Structures are given as structure tokens and as C-alpha cells.
Amino acid sequence: MKPIYGLIGNPVAHSMSPDIHNAALKDLSLEGHYHAFRVENEDLEDAVKGMRALGIQGFNVTVPHKVSIMKHLDRIDESAEALGAVNTVRREKEGLVGYNTDGAGFLKSLKPSLDRPLSELSILLIGAGGAARAIFTTLAAETPKRLDVANRTPEKALAFTQRFDGEARALSLQEAEADLSAYDIVIQTTSVGMHPNVEAAPLSLANAKETCLVCDIIYNPLKTALLHEAEAKGLKTLDGVGMFIGQAALAFELWTGHEPNMEKMKSIVLQQLGGKSC
């Protein structure tokens, strides 16, 4: 049987993971097929059992399962354990093993947009889910000047900031919005603004300073409501395409042992979205 790869999450109808992974398999003349599976929270355990039964070689994990998937796996890679979330699963001799390529993928996309080292910058991270965990831990290793986390429930954000040795605060979204002028970088990691709820934004950028870089890890739509507001204010922006491609390429290599052509992956995404990346 040809190898099967996949994606589990909810929603997944918008995902371009099947497009880029299937194109990469074809480009490298590798057998296999990648398919997206919509999985509700209450069905996650059964879905993982199904992955085992079907002999699926590897799969990506997206919202809302990046944290809850961990208890259903046979082993968690050390880096994913430290990040507290899994976005990639590979079938190995010992069973299903969880990895995380989110943090490395995001950092790879962020650095070309910076004119100073992260150690000189104050950062606001919006959200406290699986992707936020990965990005927070990766950024913390870069020792930024300040690394605050804002979330609808500040208690969840507090669990992040307590792990950082430097200056960090856990904030409500309202508190972050009021103090937005303190940040050089704002990073939006939640599903707010994702297709089909494209008019939504987690907070207003009214108080952001002129030099602020606004990042949104969502890539569909290419420009979220938050990024549209940032552009209208003349702020620099970074969409989620770079992170999406970066983490996908790392996952693909984990499964197949082959490095995909990232430029081809990016061109597929931009063609599907009908625009140019920020």
C-alpha cells in the first residue's frame, strides 16, 4: 500500500497542507498521498486509533489538538516536550512519536523582517494555545528584551510567562490593547480571523507605535483583519505563509527523509490565495 500522510484538526477545509505535501511528493517522485481529516475534540482519541489502524506514516496536527494529542502518542520528542505541544507525528518502531516544527518554522520566517536582534526588542504574543507555546519557547531562547503574553484568560498566559527568566507579563487582551505602544513586535497566534470568520480580530491596533511589526500566523486569508488594520496604519506586517511553509518542510523531511523545494511550496500557496505574501 502506498504511504498515507495527513492532517487532523478542526477546521481543516481551508488547509493547503494537502496541496503542498502532495505536490512535494510528486516533485520528488515519491509514492504516497496526504489527506486532511476534520476531527472534533471528543473524537480525537478515536481518530488516533484510526491512524494506527490505517498504518498512516505521519500526520500534522493543527488547532485545537496540538496539546491534547500528546497523551495519545507513544513518545514525545524532547523538543516538543519542552514546547508543550505537538504539530507533527511520525510512525516509528516504537509507535507514534510527536514532534514540533512550529517554533523553528516561525523563527525562520521572522528573522528576515528584523532590523535589530531579538535581544533588543519587546514582544507581545497573543494567544496561549499549542502554536503559541512553541513560538514562546523558541523566542524565549533568543532572550528578547521583553516577552509578554495576552490571552482571553490571563491565567493560561501566566503559565507561559512563569517559564521565562527575563521580563514577562501575562495580560488580558484589554490590558495588552491599552499598552500596545510598548511593543516592537506583535504576534497573533490564535485562530481569530481564520477563514471563514475573516472579519474578526483579537484586538485593536489603535495604540501600536509606528515602527511595530505585526505578525499573524494565519495564512488563509493571506491578509487577516488584523494585518489589514496594520497596513492601514502604515505598520510593517508578516503573514503566516513563511511559518506555514517552514514547519511543513520540516515535517515532510521527518516523514520521508527528503527535503522539499520550499519555493515551489510557497508558490502553490500564493497561487491558491491569489496574492503576494506580506
Swiss-Prot record:
A Pfam short name: Shikimate_dh_N
One GO BP: amino acid biosynthetic process
Residue positions binding shikimate: 15-17, 62, 87, 102, 219
Keyword Thylakoid: no
Broad class of enzyme this protein falls into: oxidoreductase
Coiled coil stretches, renumbered: none
Pathway(s) served: Metabolic intermediate biosynthesis; chorismate biosynthesis; chorismate from D-erythrose 4-phosphate and phosphoenolpyruvate: step 4/7
Active site (record annotation): 66 (proton acceptor)
Alphabetically ordered keywords of this record: Amino-acid biosynthesis, Aromatic amino acid biosynthesis, NADP, Oxidoreductase
Protein family: Belongs to the shikimate dehydrogenase family.
Primary role: Involved in the biosynthesis of the chorismate, which leads to the biosynthesis of aromatic amino acids. Catalyzes the reversible NADPH linked reduction of 3-dehydroshikimate (DHSA) to yield shikimate (SA).
Name of protein: Shikimate dehydrogenase (NADP(+))
Organism (species): Bacillus licheniformis (strain ATCC 14580 / DSM 13 / JCM 2505 / CCUG 7422 / NBRC 12200 / NCIMB 9375 / NCTC 10341 / NRRL NRS-1264 / Gibson 46)
